[in-house]
Regions:
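Hydrophobic positions on the alpha1 helix immediately C-terminal to the Walker A/P-loop
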Residues: 161
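Conserved glycine(s) of the Walker
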Residues: 156-158
Length: 283
């Protein structure tokens, strides 16, 4: 059993990273200085002062294993076991982790950045799930305070669309993992995350959809079921249990009933950004 409660005075700035991602605040404590510096560079846009956080703060403690295991050539999803008290145990090829039932504490034993990143993603996905939200593999772009989230299979054009939008001067919230959640009385929100291209910013989510290629760019309505199938494939499942799957299905269903389902058919040119700008400006 690991004692993971935060000390009353909070962690010192040089011993921990305090991150704020999509309204979720987490402190990451890493003993290895080199790894801590690497994480600080990676998460630089999302680092905040721990003393200014009035909301609930989660804590992740990462330590080196007693006996190191070799990193695999090809990684698979970790095995997940839910304990009777609701805690989760994750077992990867070269790391192990324990997450408390309330999502506020995690202990990771492993080497390098990957175990820490993996557990952070699970913690964020669980926090979003408690809000009725999702963590989605996709690209989210924003214009005049409104955002559109697009998801799809590998090669669908998510990174390409993000690059085209950035070239047009648009704001890319994220082009790898996008956080979305319902805000009581305010509709859905979309926010960037630190992975790959990501901004510490959020916007009102006004459309969710899929991508397709063509020589002419256009924004068109799409059946919610078609978007839903792709959304479920690309939403990060925080725990592979009936509870986790049920929460994901419920959140996806609500999202598709409250946010416009669309399809962006786009060419690899400036017309893609123009189609998005027009739709979001009039949405």
């Amino acid at each position: 059993v690991h004692s993971l409660s935060l000390p009353p005075e909070g962690p010192t700035a040089d011993a921990a990273l305090c991150l704020r991602i999509a309204g979720w605040t987490g402190v990451v404590e890493v003993g290895d200085a080199g790894l801590r510096d690497s994480l600080r560079r990676m998460f630089s846009r999302f680092v905040v002062s721990p003393r200014r956080q009035g909301s609930e703060v989660a804590r992740l403690v990462a330590v080196a294993p007693a006996q190191a295991r070799p990193a695999p050539v090809i990684r698979e999803l970790p095995r997940v076991l839910r304990e009777e008290d609701g805690a989760l145990r994750l077992a990867g090829e070269d790391y192990d982790a324990t997450l408390s039932a309330d999502g506020l504490q995690a202990h990771v034993e492993g080497q390098g950045r990957f175990p820490v990143e993996t557990v952070l993603k699970v913690m964020l996905a669980r926090a979003l799930a408690r809000r009725g939200g999702l963590l989605v593999h996709g690209v989210a772009v924003a214009h005049q305070g409104k955002a559109a989230l697009f998801t799809g299979h590998s090669g669908a054009g998510k990174s390409t669309l993000g690059a085209l939008w950035a070239q047009a001067g648009g704001q890319v919230l994220s082009d790898e993992l996008v956080a979305v959640w319902p805000e009581p009385g305010q509709g859905w929100r979309a926010a960037g995350t630190p992975w790959n291209v990501g901004q510490a910013a959020e916007a009102e989510l006004s459309a969710v959809g899929t991508l397709a290629w063509d020589v002419v760019s256009r924004w068109e309505p799409q059946a919610a079921g078609d978007v839903g199938r792709m959304l479920l494939v690309n939403a990060l499942l925080p725990e592979a249990t009936p509870v986790g799957r049920g929460g994901l299905l419920g959140a996806a269903g609500r999202l598709l009933s409250e946010v416009s389902p669309v399809r962006l058919v786009f060419a690899r040119d400036a017309s893609a950004a123009a189609a998005i700008q027009g739709a979001l400006a009039n949405g």
